[in-house]
Each structure stands twice: as structure tokens, then as C-alpha cells.
Amino acid sequence: MPAATMATPGYLACRTSVATLLFFVLLRRAAILGAGGAPSPARIVDYLIGYTRVGDMDKLYSQYADRYLDVTLHGCERAVVDPLGDMRHVLASEGASGQEFTASVIWYYVFPDVCFAPVFRREYLRCIRPRKLEDCYTTSPFMWTREFYVDAFLAGSGTGIELLGLNKKLTGTYMLVVRVGTTTRTALVTVNVVGECPTTMEEVTTTLRGNCWRGRQYTTDFNGDGMYLFDTEEEHRRIVYKAYQDKLKVASPNATDAPISYPRAYTGADERLAPYTLQPVSTDDHYLPGCPWGIGCDLDQTSASGVIEIEDHDESDVRLVSYPPPTLPSPGPGGNENGAGYSDNRPDPKVVGPTVGPGAIILVVMCAPILIGLTAFTIRKYC
């Protein structure tokens, strides 16, 4: 383009308008990011991803958990796993001051080399004297990895999950991390699948492996890839139960209608379990002899289960923490906290996306018509 043309007032005005419009777009994005609503790596912008930092998962994993639980699933059995149980005393303690606080519930699948793959996450903001997590005024949508996890609130505590028709590839250790204000509660659940359930979906552990992060990466970030957004738990329940019925039909083709049995309930012990003394493990890798997963296998067929832990990313420091297995309750429904005898007059929590401050909203509303109109006029006249 000739220099004379580039210097014309129309051309300069066109470039100025385009630059102004670009500045407006960047300003709006900066307002959203500055308000704590950064888009997730999975590009799901209406999820409050990363608002509550997880912290160093290696430290959480190497410390003694508040609850330990062993779960054995037979074939296409379904089970409600609620290791932490009633959280009302924790919520009451954090809310005693009357100050707002945040909370989060995250389940991880833990690989033998101590790599954490999130399978469920939900966050709660603006919690003011809540009786249960759902009383918080702002709640993020449900985020799931795969459709065989369902109904995080069936157990009543708001932190449990239901497992339906897991296959043997998902045998291993699951870690629950619940943060309520300044309080953290953890649980390690060893899931052993006895008997195969038909697979009606893609290779699951491969997907989890591709989306697992090392412990210290969770201190400053969170990987949202591989997780799916469900606006309502009813939508997720419909999808997962349909997949579960398909599995049952494959397992029992002669059945006219695939029945969905009532789930078994697995809950944690009433008191914190005291771990045994740490025992050194002599092994060249992260796997125990005769234990394909390296986690959650019996030590001598009669002793307690164990879990490998690695501290400070030193792969030579592999230790085994053994603990007494809890006594499992009789099969039956998980409790329902909503029927605890109190009335809840709070408004329904809102599922919201990234939050934007009032100043940013006013600025966008005032400047948008002017900038868009100026840009359109200039482009029509000079470009």
C-alpha cells in the first residue's frame, strides 16, 4: 500500500476504531479474569474453576487421612460411598464467626505413582452459617470425569458419591478432599472390583491417566480437562442410569427390564482411625509383589489394607502406611440430611458462572454502545 494512502485520515481512523474495539474486548476479558472467573483449561467458562486452590496434594496424601474405607464391588453392583459422613459440625465451627467462607468437594483417582486425576469437583462460595453445603448462596455446577459417578448428595453429607457398575480397571485408591473455610478433611477409599461388569464406554483409565497431575501442580492451578459439566444433578443421573441399565442388559440379556437395585452404603468410622507405625517397604518400583495396582492390596491376606505414599517427589522414599479396616455397616440407604428435623428458609443456591465486579459491569454497559457505534460508523465510512 502506498505511503500516501496509509497516511490518509480515513485509514488512520479505521485503524484507530479497530484498535479501540480490540481494547474493549481485552478490557472485558481482564475484568472477568480479575474477578476470579478465569476460564478453565477445559474452556468451560461458566465453571468457577480454580477459585478455591487445592493446595499441595502430596502433603495431603502423605499425611494421615481422617477416614479410611475399603469397598468391594461385585460385578455390576452399585454402592454409595460416603467416608466423611455428617459435615454439620465442621460447617457450624467455620460459620460461628458469621463471616463468609468458601468450600469445595473434590474426588481424585490416585495412580500407583501418586498422580492425581480429578473425577468430581464442586465449589461453594458465600457460605454464611450454613447447615449443609447446599445452603451456600453461590454454587458451581457439577463437574464429572465419566458417567459412572452419580448423585454426590444421595448419602446426605454432600461429599459422598455413588459408584455404578465399575469395571476392574477402576480398582484402586480414591481420595476425597473437602475444604470448608480453613478446615480440611480427607479420606482414602480403596475400591476393589470383584467380577467384571460389561464395558459400554471407552478405555477409562487411559483417559484418567492423560488428565492426572502431580501433587504440587495443584498448589497454583487445577486441570479441568477431561471433566464434563452438568447443569443439574438430574441430568447427570439420567445419563448415568441409562448407561448402567445398558450394562445390566448386556450382563443379563434374558431380563425384560434391567432392574436397578438399591445401593449398598459404605460410610466412614465414627472416630478418626489411628494408623499403625510406618513400615519400610523394600521394592524397586511403586508396585508391591502380587499387587497389580500397588495400592489397596492386602499385606498378608488377613492384615489391613495399605496405601503407598511418596513425599517430596523422591521416588526412592516409598513407604507403606497400614491401618485397621473399618467395620462396614449393614446394606441399606445412606442417610438423608434434609430430614434431620430442621427447616431451611434460605433461598435456593444459584448456579452461576464467572463473577464480575459492579465497576466492570458499569464500565462495559456505558462504553459498549459508544464503542460499537463509533466502530461501525468509521468502518462504513472509511474502510
Swiss-Prot record:
One of its GO terms (biological process) is symbiont entry into host cell. The chain crosses the membrane at residues 359-379. Residues 380-383 are intravirion. Residues 315-349 are annotated as: Disordered. GO terms for cellular component: membrane; viral envelope; virion membrane. It is found in: Virion membrane. Residues 244-311 are annotated as: Profusion. It is a single-pass type I membrane protein. The keyword Phosphoprotein does not apply. Residues 1-30 form the signal peptide. Disulfide bonds join C76-C197, C115-C212, C127-C136. The keyword Transmembrane applies. Residues 31-358 are virion surface. Its main location: virion. Keywords: Disulfide bond, Glycoprotein, Host-virus interaction, Membrane, Signal, Transmembrane, Transmembrane helix, Viral attachment to host cell, Viral attachment to host entry receptor, Viral envelope protein, Virion, Virus entry into host cell. Residues 323-332 have a biased composition (Pro residues). Envelope glycoprotein that binds to host cell entry receptors, promoting the virus entry into host cells. May trigger fusion with host membrane, by recruiting the fusion machinery composed of gB and gH/gL. Belongs to the herpesviridae glycoprotein D family. This is Envelope glycoprotein D. It comes from Psittacid herpesvirus 1 (isolate Amazon parrot/-/97-0001/1997) (PsHV-1). The gene is US6.
